[in-house]
Every structure is written in C-alpha cells, then in structure tokens.
Design a protein with these regions (language model features):
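N-terminal intrinsically disordered, cationic/polar leader segments
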Residues: 1-104
Length: 104
C-alpha cells in the first residue's frame, strides 16, 4: 500500500461534499470535502492511497491534467484498487460534476 500526497492550485471552492465510486478491483473511491468556510487557501489537497506501488509519475500526470482543467479546491481522498488512468479520470470528473450540482 502506498500513500501519495499532492497539492494543486484551485480557482473555485467545491460547494458540496461528494462520494463517488467504490474500492474494488480495477476501480477507486473518491471523497471530496469542500474547504472550511472562511478558508483563504484555494488549493486542491489530494491524498491517494493505492494498492499498486511505483506509479507516482502516472498519478501525478493524471491529477495535474485534471486539475489544470477542473480546479476545485477542497480535500480530495482517492482510495485506489488498481484503477487505470482512464477510470481515475472518469471518477474525478464524476466527483467534480456531483460537487457542482450536476453542472460540468
């Protein structure tokens, strides 16, 4: 089990808490908590817990690409059980859409 942490600049606070996906083979769970009210830090703090070691660069690249286009501030928790980069991107987009109340 490996834990990775990242911080990305974010332009908008996530308005809602979100839970998408499940921790199952080839999938991952994402928990998103909005920043505390009154917080001045506008960053996306990401913690990845993964069952697959050695993919630090891949995780960084996938997350950087996502947060470049979707900069939602908050605490992101990703619990991975071997998801491919495509599944990770899908779940991240689902979480962002749910946090914004269905608005892309």
């Amino acid at each position: 089990m490996q834990t990775l942490t990242y911080d990305f600049p974010a332009g908008q606070a996530a308005p809602n808490a979100v839970h998408v996906g499940v921790v199952a083979s080839g999938d991952l769970e994402i928990l998103l908590e909005p920043p505390p009210s009154g917080a001045t830090d506008s960053s996306a703090s990401v913690r990845v817990r993964t069952s697959v070691d050695g993919f630090d660069t891949v995780w960084h690249d996938v997350l950087e690409r996502f947060f470049t286009h979707t900069s939602l501030a908050g605490r992101w928790e990703l619990n991975d059980f071997g998801a491919t980069p495509g599944v990770v991107t899908l779940r991240l987009r689902q979480a962002a859409e749910a946090a914004l109340g269905g608005q892309p």
